[in-house]
Amino acid sequence: YIIEIEQNRYKVSSVKLSKTVMNKLRKNSKKKSSYASNKIEGNPLSEKQVNEVIESDERKHYLKPEQEVRNYFLALNYLEEKVNKKEKFSKKLILDVQKLVEKGASKEKIGLRGPMPPGVLFAVYDSKTGNPDYIPPEYCDIPGLLDELIEYVNTTDDHPLIVAAVVHYQLVTIHPFEDGNGRTARLLSGYIMDLNGYGFNGVGSLEEYFAYDIDEYYESIQMGLPALYYSGRENPPHPEIWIHYFLRMVKLYSGKVCDLQLASEEEDIAGSLSFLKGKEKELLQFLMKNYRGEFTPIEVSRELSVTNKTIINRLAVLVKNGFVIPILVKERIRSYELSEFTRDHETEIMKMIGSGKRRSSK
């Protein structure tokens, strides 16, 4: 699976999208992740409702399912900032993420879990039978187990995708919190991928693939082991069951991201060109053929035998649509240059302008 994921990663790295399109894709991906990750935990909201809740203005009171999806979205934004700062995996990061996931919940649900009242067993119960599905480690073992996980993440030579799978498994299994363990595990597993260059530009939702078959997700993470942590889950005999499942989901997700970004790239160029009139397209074509560096409206107007004002007006449209950028000197535009977007997509833009011309001349 890793070879195929690497191939998809390489394909995605060659795709260049405008800032506007990339931001839109990232936001939609975060919404999908917020929907899917909470769906795994039994959140009843539909994808449409999740979208509406995230887009709605901040208000004082939310229903619990609404608060949960907003919290997940906020946590994704928070981790995006941390990736940009290259922040290491740490206990503080784990606690901060869980605090965001449980924002609005009662105090005892935030932070590491403590002792239970005498005679009460802390366990994850089957909602239908009432029997314990999973009995996590004792609360007093949690700090040491987290320290071991953090040391592993920051010192191992394992492939980053294996590390992400281990973080996911261990945070669900150590179950350090009263609530929010699964969501925190999925967020921080994604963070490890992002931090190591496997975030696929923040596009697509890995959580979506876990949510497609929730039973398979839980069966893979449980690996057929007894309910008690100390009866095998602390050191699973066949970790490859979970690792293979995790990598298969990443492979499917990375393939979808490839398709999504390649399709978006074509739409992005065509969309930007659709705002240009014939003369503006001709000017863009001329600039791409004749200028590698800076140029001024006056020199372009002389070469094209049109007025300076006409060129300035056409350049304003090219600037607005991201093809050209103005160079300011003392807050005044002195010259222009082709944008990075234009240079990255020069061949495709030329082809699209050319095919558009041929169609209109029939």
Where are these regions (language model features)?
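FIC/Doc superfamily catalytic core
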Residues: 1-362
